[in-house]
Curated annotation (Swiss-Prot):
Self-association state and partner proteins as the record states: Interacts with RNA polymerase I 194 kDa subunit (RPA194) and with casein kinase-II. Interacts with DKC1/NAP57, NOP58 and fibrillarin.
Role of this protein: Nucleolar protein that acts as a regulator of RNA polymerase I by connecting RNA polymerase I with enzymes responsible for ribosomal processing and modification. Required for neural crest specification: following monoubiquitination by the BCR(KBTBD8) complex, associates with TCOF1 and acts as a platform to connect RNA polymerase I with enzymes responsible for ribosomal processing and modification, leading to remodel the translational program of differentiating cells in favor of neural crest specification.
GO biological process, one term: regulation of translation
Record PTM: Undergoes rapid and massive phosphorylation/dephosphorylation cycles on CK2 and PKC sites. NOLC1 is one of the mostly phosphorylated proteins in the cell.
Entry-annotated residues carrying Phosphoserine: S87, S88, S91, S92, S372, S373, S376, S465, S567, S587, S627, S648, S691, S703
Location(s), subcellular: Cytoplasm; Nucleus, Nucleolus
Domain of life: Eukaryota
Protein name stated in the entry: Nucleolar and coiled-body phosphoprotein 1
UniProt family annotation: Belongs to the NOLC1 family.
Species of provenance: Rattus norvegicus
Length: 704
């Protein structure tokens, strides 16, 4: 699609395409929410679909995109992860477009954002309806970015340079590498990635736009820069993730935006957004995985609501996201290579690090999970909202200092993930979404930790770097990238556990989640499987928050030590075993209730069933079988006409003195072959019967 054509496009032009795409893919719930949020109507049946547009775009835009993308995007194209390359192209186009429109004016910005939509729409088709929705959010974000600061364009130019680094880093960990690049490009880039997250938050929460705009300016420079550079390379993944996350967020955003606006307060979200550049990448990674799952379930578009949702999921999902956020920040601080390896590490380390991170918030998540998910989400969002504002204030302060920025970015990143997590918590209601929710809750925890202890973050970074190094040990899968980012963040959080405890207030309930987080992190290699197992664990952990609290207290300190991690993992294993006993699908409590109900009901029903069959059917059947073989026709039940009752020769009229009487006397005793033999002998011999009578001895039945 030519730039001129894209500039003419308006975001609303894509709504029908997205709506049609969602409906075509049987995402009726998402489609209905999207239609309500955007007021879009079904497109003409003859109009081209998003898939068609995307396929055309792939064919027509590759060469021009290479030129536009230049450094970072080209490298990514070389990588050519199908979805990531597409998303990178989309992000690069969006970045290029964003730069031009930002310079031109707000109106051009809208156009640029729309073109991005078009590019995103193509990406959406490949990514799925969630990616489409996210692309729309990205368009909105682009618009916001442009009006917020045209300055961002300069950062973009700077950011463009870092993409090569990302290209150098493994593609599978492009998200983590993008996080690394943020630190490498020097915290402005981190701010840029954070800026992307803020833009998402802004689009998600309309109420926040004012403060986010403030936060964005800081992040905006970073936004444009990192969004253009890191987003061109990492944002290829990020854009995909953002698209997916954004799509769900957009759909749920209208409803949850209100909730998020009230509890989170704009200031906290903006600051977190700005600092959450790294987190945004990790979140996006998770979101990429989750959006598909989330589509089926409810979405929380607003980061604050996501926090509340994340609290619910904190027990299960928070461990992953928290770990991802803390570890990504650490890995980003350490180096892009470490971040790449960190994604791998995250698979291994998440289990260890997650335990310490989740302890503070996980318990609340369990509690919330116990309470209705919606009410608990709102409560958790409110609770976390105060914590986030604090972190927001701290993160801006920390930004001036170069070292503080990485922590701030981490803390901020956690907020973004919470936003993603917000959506995930809802999906969490769905089992598949449980892992996503866990990551979101962990992100929220990471934000609190960062708020309470900026210094601790620095220390955490040092510690996480070691885990990041370990990460290379575990080969990173593309799926493990999100987990790896979360595990990296979690690595950062381990030093923070004291801060988390402080933020936790009642640490005991939160520690319970720590075990969950540990179990989840340990199972990070298979996040979805782990999430289901973790969910099982959560119900049990909820039942016994105190022991877990004790464990959580021990865990944070021990997490730094391998022994502590191992012990935590063992605890997680025990929890998993216990939970394994429970049913896999559904929330732990629900499962328990269902199981108990089933057990209570089934025994009675079984007893009843046993009694009935044993008594009536079995006795009757047994008696009948024992007494006689099966008879379709029972003699005693049928009345036979007397005329037909006896068919013997003697019973017939005129039998006495009949011509065949003598023969009958001889033959009536023989049956089978011998009867024919005997009859033949009688015919050949000198047999002489009586006189042959012409009387009719047959029986005549009157038609009745």
């Amino acid at each position: 699609m030519a730039d001129t054509g894209l500039r003419r496009v308006v975001p609303s032009d894509l709504y029908p395409l997205v709506l049609g795409f969602l409906r075509d893919n049987q995402l009726s719930e998402v489609a209905s929410k999207f239609a309500k949020a955007t007021g879009a109507t079904q497109q003409d049946a003859n109009a081209s679909s998003l898939l068609d547009i995307y396929s055309f775009w792939l064919k027509s835009t590759k060469a021009p995109k290479v030129k536009l993308q230049s450094n970072g995007p080209v490298a990514k194209k070389a990588k050519k992860e199908t979805s990531s390359s597409d998303s990178s192209e989309d992000s690069s186009e969006e970045e290029d477009k964003a730069q031009v429109p930002t310079q031109k004016a707000a109106a051009p910005a809208k156009r640029a954002s729309l073109p991005q939509h078009a590019g995103k729409a193509a990406a959406k088709a490949s990514e799925s309806s969630s990616s489409e929705e996210s692309s729309e959010e990205e368009e909105e974000e682009d618009k916001k970015k442009k009006p917020v600061q045209q300055k961002a364009v300069k950062p973009q130019a700077k950011a463009v340079r870092p993409p090569p680094k990302k290209a150098e880093s493994s593609e599978s960990e492009s998200d983590s590498s993008s996080e690394d690049e943020a630190p490498q490009t020097q915290k402005p880039k981190a701010a840029a990635t954070a800026a992307k997250a803020p833009t998402k938050a802004q689009t998600k929460a309309p109420a926040k736009p004012g403060p986010p705009a403030k936060a964005q300016p800081k992040a905006a420079n970073g936004k444009a820069g990192s969004s253009s550079s890191s987003s061109s390379s990492s944002s290829s993944d990020d854009s995909e993730e953002e698209k997916k996350a954004a799509a769900p967020l957009k759909k749920t955003a209208p409803k949850k935006q209100v909730v998020a606006k009230a509890p989170v307060k704009v200031t906290a979200a903006p600051t977190q957004k700005s600092s959450s550049s790294e987190d945004s990448s990790s979140e996006e990674e998770e979101e990429q995985k989750k959006p598909m799952k989330k589509k089926a379930g409810p979405y929380s578009s607003v980061p604050p609501p996501s926090v509340s949702l994340s609290k619910k999921s904190v027990g299960a999902q928070s461990p992953k996201k928290a770990a991802a956020q803390t570890q990504p920040a650490d890995s980003s601080a350490d180096s892009s290579e470490e971040s790449d390896s960190s994604s791998e590490e995250e698979k291994k380390t998440p289990a260890k690090t997650v335990v310490s991170k989740t302890p503070a918030k996980p318990a609340p998540v369990k509690k919330k999970a116990e309470s209705s998910s919606d009410s608990s989400d709102s409560d958790s969002s409110e609770d976390e909202a105060p914590a986030k504002p604090v972190s927001a204030t701290k993160s801006p302060l920390s930004k001036p200092a170069v070292t503080p920025k990485p922590p701030a970015a981490k803390a901020v990143a956690t907020p973004k993930q919470p936003a993603g997590s917000g959506q995930k918590p809802q999906s969490r209601k769905a089992d598949s979404s449980s892992s996503e929710e866990e990551s979101s809750s962990s992100e929220e925890e990471a934000t609190k930790k960062s708020v309470t202890t900026p210094k601790a973050r620095v220390t955490a970074k040092a510690a996480p770097s070691l885990p990041a190094k370990q990460a290379p040990r575990a080969g990173g899968d593309s799926s493990s990238d999100s987990e790896s980012s979360s595990s990296e963040e979690e690595k950062k959080t381990p030093p923070k556990p004291p801060a988390k405890k402080k933020a936790a207030g009642a640490a005991v309930p939160k520690p319970t989640p720590v075990k969950k987080a540990a179990a989840e992190s340990s199972s990070s290699s298979s996040s979805s499987e782990d999430s289901s197992e973790e969910e099982k664990k959560k119900p049990k952990s909820k039942a016994t928050p105190k022991p877990q609290a004790g464990k959580a207290n021990g865990v944070p300190a021990s997490q730094n030590g391998k022994a502590g991690k191992e012990s935590e993992e063992e605890e997680e294993d025990t929890e998993q075993n216990k939970k394994a006993a429970g049913t896999k699908p559904g929330s732990g409590k629900k499962r328990k209730h269902n199981e108990t109900a089933d057990e209570a009901a089934t025994p009675q029903s079984k007893k009843v069933k046993l009694q009935t069959p044993n008594t009536f059917p079995k006795r009757k059947k047994g008696e009948k079988r024992a007494s006689s073989p099966f008879r379709r026709v029972r003699e005693e039940e049928i009345e036979v006409d007397s005329r037909v009752a006896d068919n013997s020769f003697d019973a017939k009229r005129g039998a006495a003195g009949d011509w065949g009487e003598r023969a009958n006397q001889v033959l009536k005793f023989t049956k089978g072959k011998s009867f024919r033999h005997e009859k033949t002998k009688k015919k050949r011999g000198s047999y002489r019967g009586g006189s042959i009578s012409v009387q009719v001895n047959s029986v005549k039945f009157d038609s009745e």
